């Protein structure tokens, strides 16, 4: 164990020595010639201003990017002069992942190609493509068109594929190697969870600092089309509703409801989810809390004439505490994360406690050390260690 810790410390020192010589600017910072910390603290975690920027179609109001469009002489054409692109590269060295008792060079863990921006006034796009995700070409995950400020109001419309949980907490922008496990939980053969799906989303902000989100979804994830060239495997659509209320500058409370039905082979499973979440932000601390209840009436798709349907209860959540000693100007931070999933389907049961230390080597280069104790898992109790380097440029 002592030798393993020495190896981890040595690797972290090598990563820091190599990374301090690198410099890069992500796509939106490049476009507006602004620092990454305008929207991120630390990257890729979004600040409130970053959320506002994304909600405005990746445009800073009252600030035009110089020479953003090509002047073709056709006023009816909006043609980007340069395609906004960025890359995100992550690599880790892990020990005892999934209780394997192995030291593993998990690098590159992912290599992501990102592009996004305004196509024209109030219309924007965003997508990213995985050149590599844990050793395979995973393809497109987020990919959508956004219509901003419809009918002159604060109503926004998205169509494409996105994470269902994005209006709650954005798991793709989390700081930890450890995931938000409850968002991935789906009992039996159900395809519906709170990760990626295809559909449409409406968002609306009220003057009372109330944010409302409605999602209409296929409920089948983002797999390939069937032989009929349909992405959905049945005639049903799932509905998600979200409301979030700011209560002053330091506290936010949210609620979420999900109602769905799936019948891939004409045998149905009906489900619902209810969730509550909260954020308390009192500098230099931020505390995020998520709780979710889920019910499925036939997630194993038992045929009524052959076997009785098995109802499944699933519940869980996470609690995350982030410490930024100097706020936006912090060069290092600490994070603690508790995960909990409890289900009638035992393979979903999970519990873990994570401690994470991160240090910015540059504004867009982050080195991390993470220790996770999984006290409930299909792999039995175990400790996982990970040292990582995350870059965006």
Question: What are these model-predicted stretches?
Answer:
Residues 91-97, 129-135, 161-165, 216-220, ...:
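Transmembrane beta-strands of outer-membrane beta-barrel pores
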Residues 33-43:
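The canonical Cys-X-X-Cys-His
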Residues 67-72, 83, 91, 109-111, ...:
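Hydrophobic, lipid-facing positions within transmembrane beta-strands of outer-membrane proteins
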Residues 44-47, 80-95, 99-222, 235-239, ...:
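Outer membrane beta-barrel
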Residues 72-78, 119-121, 146-151, 206-208, ...:
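Outer-membrane beta-barrel proteins
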Residues 35, 245, 381-393:
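Outer-membrane beta-barrel "beta-signal"
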Residues 234, 244-344:
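Detector for outer-membrane/organellar transmembrane beta-barrel domains
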């Amino acid at each position: 164990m002592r030798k393993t810790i020495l190896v981890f410390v040595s690797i972290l020192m090598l990563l820091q020595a190599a990374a301090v010589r690198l410099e890069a600017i992500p796509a939106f910072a490049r476009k507006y010639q602004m620092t990454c910390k305008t929207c991120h603290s630390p990257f890729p975690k979004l600040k409130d201003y970053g959320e506002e920027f994304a909600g405005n179609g990746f445009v800073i109001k009252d600030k035009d990017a110089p020479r953003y469009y090509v002047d073709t002489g056709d006023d009816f054409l909006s043609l980007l002069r340069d395609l906004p692109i960025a890359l995100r590269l992550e690599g880790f060295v892990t020990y005892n992942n999934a209780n394997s008792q192995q030291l593993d060079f998990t690098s590159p863990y992912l290599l992501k190609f990102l592009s996004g921006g305004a196509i024209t006034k109030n219309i924007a796009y965003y997508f990213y493509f995985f050149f590599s995700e844990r050793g395979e070409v995973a393809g497109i995950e987020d990919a959508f068109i956004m219509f901003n400020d419809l009918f002159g109001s604060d109503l926004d419309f998205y169509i494409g594929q996105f994470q269902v949980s994005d209006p709650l907490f954005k798991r793709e922008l989390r700081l930890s190697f450890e995931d938000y496990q409850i968002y991935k939980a789906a009992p039996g053969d159900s395809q519906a969870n709170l990760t990626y799906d295809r559909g449409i989303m409406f968002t609306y902000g009220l003057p009372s600092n109330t944010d409302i989100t409605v999602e209409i979804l296929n409920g089948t994830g983002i797999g390939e089309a069937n032989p009929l060239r349909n992405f959905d495997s049945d005639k049903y659509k799932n509905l998600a509703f979200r409301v979030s209320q700011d209560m002053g500058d330091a506290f936010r409370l949210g609620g979420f409801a999900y109602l769905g039905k799936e019948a891939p082979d004409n045998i149905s499973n009906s489900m619902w989810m209810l969730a509550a979440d909260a954020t308390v932000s009192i500098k230099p601390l931020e505390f995020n809390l998520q709780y979710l209840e889920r019910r499925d009436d036939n997630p194993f798709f038992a045929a009524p004439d052959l076997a009785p349907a098995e109802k499944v209860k699933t519940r869980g959540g996470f609690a995350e505490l982030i410490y930024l000693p100097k706020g936006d100007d912090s060069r290092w931070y600490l994070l603690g994360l508790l995960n909990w999933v409890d289900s009638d389907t035992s393979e979903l049961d999970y519990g873990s406690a994570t401690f994470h230390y991160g240090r910015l080597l540059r504004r867009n280069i982050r080195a991390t050390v993470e220790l996770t104790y999984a006290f409930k898992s299909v792999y039995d109790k175990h400790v996982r260690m990970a040292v990582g380097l995350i870059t965006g440029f």
